[in-house]
């Protein structure tokens, strides 16, 4: 299975707990306010706790210079509107609760009534302080166990959060703590001329557990970058300036001495740009030629102002955070990406960019960001770890609680999975996917075709695409409609291979869309077009009911007016309308209109579109093949569960919306044909987001999946692997008790009734928040599919664990790995067992199975599809009928209608 074993370094600096560590106690804080209509917040709970400590010191006769309050480590909540509920201390207050009545001054302003007589609209300031009385109760919960990694991780996070500034749950380094002058310059070449440009290194800290050790991770500060081309930035109409507008920028991103566009860090060193007259060119040549004067003037203007550079280095670091966008530009999908600001180039210019970014004054420049390779990151992270060790203030705080960590990154053995092979046709011909092949599209000749499965509404098997339709707005003219119809038909037939004869030409339907912008995005014309489609089908099948005609429609391709930012509402309406009728749809934006008519689509867009259409119609574009000696290659059912939570209702920030659970299972040997289920979940106090499922729901999901698998294979599977997403370390025990144990009991009963031995059941939790970065010691890039085994003593309680990155290397930057935890194994196999390695191989292989991407994605494709299913049903379909109950939607469950 593995090709080689290498030694890699990871940005993980282990901590040790000193033998002389003093015991640490965790306390619960309960505050009951007697003032009516008063909501306790973070700041006021902190004041109440301070008054409690003063009274406790008086009762015990403590020295005011050594007050109890200064020995506390407060666990501040993530929201300022929530009160403090927990803190830690080395002072033992006893096993009995301690209660004091306190009085403090609150700075909360009363709510403005406004708009009527006696209101407070004119009194902007309001009262300065309000006296509040409260009953404060402190209860000792437990004594922290130094051998409990989770307890120590919690305590260490709180310690570091008190030492440094907190931001979004991560730990930002305080200004002035790290000496920026040592690594603040970097020499770059711009058009053959050398300039010293200022780079600002910024880091953030987090903690993690690995190999049974608690460790500190030093990560680069990251931000999301807006998808905006250089041409748009320099030529946009700025209009009125925002009061917090940014002064400065010619935005350029640097990587290895070359200039890149921020928004389009793509694979390879070339880009096709309309500004380059459609020809291929590398980034450095293109920008040097196009913006040579601006780069030179910007760099020189900065270098002439030494005082300005020095003042920037002494100030707080500032990051340009803009709204991320996603669009398709000349066949290349442009996505917002996380890039570290540890290497930030500052180029001053006299242009103004009114992005409306808060907390940035007009005398500060904007920042262009770049990627950093793992070895460069580890070098800077290790240097920073040395700075932490030399800091007396930090070491004094950590030493008091018995912590000490090393400044050397952890080295460990790294294994590599071989890339899988793809089955491309009915003869199971195998083609190897190489990392640098640019995908398998160019090698795609045939595919397995459409499987004979019962997914039609009338209960009869439907093979191929005998009846499908293409709906085009009438203003796009006949030539466009006929060309689109011809190209879609030819491309889909080429995908179908041996089953191409089953793909008929689509019925062409014109949509009477109003060309006025305000009436263009209405659903009514598309409903009328659907009635026209039924009329056409009725001419082919006279005396047939509409319900039977609808059941014959395999798929409808709907062309909707662009641009994308205006068509979102129409897209949702189209999806809801057709999904309720049990019809799969594929939406396509209209092309841009020019003087010569509509511009034609890029070939890559049409290729991807036809891949989606073919998959939604029931076909498999490709299937990653497991080796025959892998036990999971036969009689295996893969399942995946994910829960999506929509955004909170606008105007109701405290309302928790209903969550949506999406469940995907496979029933065929290639793992490409799926069966989907969905259920809406109402949140509650103990399960606010709905991440933990009810016992009956998991039983229902598995029961239906086993029935589908048994109907297709005439037997139950020998192995069931369930991938689970959205489960944190603290929820694993709850998931085992609530979901898995009852599920295992049900499967045991089901297999006994079928006179079959119990299947091999495995439940794997995938955690995407793993922030570790690895680099090979030999200064070589780690190949895709690399993984490490986490041999940890506490895995006896939490399951075996491995960390894997299946994606390819881009620009020398190691992809973010995924942490997989095997939380339930009916066979209780060891991590050194061959079956466990085969499970790892299965996980890596399934990352190549997603139809919308020719290379590996970060997760197994069924887990990614479960996420898409739950997100689609929650955000598009809304709280409608569940897939378990609706007969109309039942026909879609065997097709990936949600991709």
From Swiss-Prot:
- Keyword Iron assigned to the entry: answer is no
The UniProt entry's GO CC annotations, sorted and at most eight, read: cytoplasm
Q: Which residues form the PAZ domain?
A: 229-313
Q: Where in the cell is it found?
A: Cytoplasm
* Main location (coarse class): cytoplasm
Q: Which GO terms describe its molecular function?
A: RNA binding
Per its UniProt record, what SMART domains does this chain match? Answer: Piwi
PANTHER family on file: EUKARYOTIC TRANSLATION INITIATION FACTOR 2C (PTHR22891)
Record note on domains:
PAZ domain is absent, but Ago is capable of binding small RNAs in the same way as the other Argonaute proteins.
Instruction: Describe the task this protein carries out.
Output: Plays an essential role in growth and, with Dicer, also involved in microRNA (miRNA)-mediated translational repression. The RNA interference pathway is implicated in antigenic variation having a role in regulation of variant-specific surface protein (VSP)-coding gene expression. Several VSP genes are transcribed but only transcripts encoding the VSP to be expressed accumulate. Antisense RNAs corresponding to the silenced VSP genes are detected.
> Could you tell me what this protein is called?
Protein argonaute
Q: Give the species.
A: Giardia intestinalis (strain ATCC 50581 / GS clone H7) (Giardia lamblia)
Q: What's the source species' lineage?
A: Eukaryota, Metamonada, Diplomonadida, Hexamitidae, Giardiinae
